Amino acid sequence: MSVAGIILRPWYRFASKVFATWARPTVQPEIPAELLAGNDAPVCYVLEHGGLADTLALERQCQIHGLPSPLADLQFAGIAESGQNVVLRRKRGFILRRPSTKGSKRLERLVDASIAAGGKELLLIPVAIYWGRSPDKQHAWFKLLFTENWDVAGRTRKFFATIFQGRNTLLRFSDPLPLSSIVQDGLKPEVAYRKVSRILRVHFRQRRIATVGPDLSHRRTLVNVVMHDPGVRAAIDAEAGDSRTKLERTTQKARKYAQEIAAHISYPTVRVVERFLGWVWNRIYDGIEMSHVDRLHEIARDHEIVYAPCHRSHFDYLLLSYIVYHQGLSLPHVAAGINLNMPFIGAILRRGGAFYLRRSFKGNRLYAAVFSAYLRQILVRGHSIEYFVEGGRSRTGRLLAPKGGMLAMTVGSYISEPRLPVVFVPVYFGYEKLIEGDSFISELGGAQKQKESLFGLIRSVKSLRENFGKVYVNIGEPIPLEPLLDAANPEWRTSASYEQERPPWVGDVIDELGDAIMGGINAAAAVTPISLLAYALLATPKQSMGELELHRQLALSVKLLSRFRYSESVTLPDMSPRDIVDHGEKLQVIKRTAHPLGDVVSMSEHEAVLMTYFRNNVQHLFAIPASIACCFIQGRRLEHSELQRLIRLIYPFMQAELRLKWDFDDIDDVTTDAIEALLEQKILTRQGKFLVRPSAGSAPAFQLLMMGQSMVPMLQRFYLAIALLVTNGSGILTRAKLESLCMNSAQRLAMIYGLHSPDFFDKALFHDFIRTLRARNVVRRNDAGFLEFDDDIQRIGEDARLVLGEEIRHSILSLTFSGPGFDRL
């Protein structure tokens, strides 16, 4: 060890502890020592720019996490270095600091030694340190002071950055790069050194883009770029015609559109909002549980990310951006409905990354051109994007049909200018209570949707006094765009310009992509304690159950979902049935009533209505085993093949409503797997070729009955639509008339039988069912617009006898007028 090292090393270590009193960076990964698990090769840290602050921060975190010190001597391949760190880019000059054109001499010596020693192993660990996180602004007159951007900070600026941004700093350890795998046999030392340096430079650039985002254009500059887009100019010319006066007015209109749309990210605003949101989350939620976040880190460095979450609450916008920012990734640009562009609030959201879009572009070619050009610029510059493929918030807890508008513009922008590969990331939000719950129920009951306003937001502040449980955020499996394009048209990179006319095959890609995103969201579902309680209690007539029976039903649900696993991305609660009940009681969604023979757990009528939302969140996970259980409500035994036939019959309609992932051709095998899962739980038994329900009155029989009841409302809706078709006759009803009849009949049925589920008469569900009937060619639309069908449709009604009780079937039929075929249903 050198004399300087003996003197300076203790000072460095002391200084790092003092420095840590105000500089406390967020470290990623949370346990960096795992990067070196099972590897005892010597380590050398690589810093991009270096400096005293970076060295002290790295030294302190290495002490905390038990990693080799960057200040320790490095003995490698016969050479000795006075530190286990390399600075890739230094500045020269004492007063006027300029980037040095020379590389790292230490790195050069290490590469030479590795080659001389026949490729001896050394682990290079890139360490990126960002003092404050905001990207640079292209062509801006000044940069945000003391925040991390694309400029190499000078000493004075770095000093103040550590003072003011010490606790808004990210220190990221990347995966080790084995030097031997980079330095191949036969490379000359100078060539090998240049190769290693280039790989590290590219790595740091990609990491910076993933963390702070690409350079931000000033909003005015970006608007000007949009205004010069060929598509926008063509739309202006088409609307203005030959009139010079109209050309000026149309140009101004286009500019106003661009200004209405464009985000204006302000990192000082982001930091203020981040602290405010942290306070809000801590006040109303018991925590935010995240799963599979590692998927984001795997793709962020070299992909353009389009976040595609389900839409359950207005908080979705804020939650995902908050989580992404806290994961050390660049803040996404979020597509927000123009209804959120309220006074004051809209400006804050815009500075947090929101760009606004109108609900419909129909008939406004100019607006569509401006929006498309803006989106293209965001993609081309490498910004991550977030939008809701469903379009609006789900009022029922089920996924809505994907809307193709934003997908079409994203795909079109990428085809026009493919840069970084685009991946779509499905994101699942699982809430335990919703702030908008009551308004959703009112809207499903027929009330008009309330318009967002500042006063409405102020009124909702009272919600901050309530406890909304936990929020679960699951990251789905990323969906790359290029394989879909390659499968649809291998020549898409050299085809005619997308700007001229959208090729027909692109529509198929958009449909496939939308379905894949919805499937990815469902596959990443979070099963929450509240959704399990809702699933169990809503299956009972009075939404109540003995506590012991409820414990058994909850345990069955968890075991069944573990055995019949919808997807490896689905997460289950790590709680006992007793803990789940206690949790529900704490959130006041259930109440426990003491009784000498055993406590009874129940939901109030109001809570039962709200809890249908959370049951629907997870209904797709239970759909197949619950449908099998449903077949045993009216009968005690069925052949295996008959069960498969019944599931085949209803599967296309269940698939459309619940966005189930299995292909129709595979459903027999899926049914068999679900049967085996039920047999393992001993709520079904096998007798030869028959499957048999347990003895009436037994606990397993009760469990099977409760599971089957969860699917009955869906089957009742299907049967109601068929009954209305048959009783009115072929060629009598239009699609719109049938939908209206279905909704009104279901609403009356719910009133008579006290069905606490407003989604039972949701018009959108009947719309999807009728659309599936048409897609399966069960019904057809004639030239006059009326629905026609054959006698085959009556088979569905006849099979309903096996599932639906006689009382409910007659109640449904009593709501319809007698007509041809009435007596056969």
What feature does the model see in each segment?
Residues 1-825:
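Membrane-interfacial terminal anchoring regions of lipid-handling membrane enzymes
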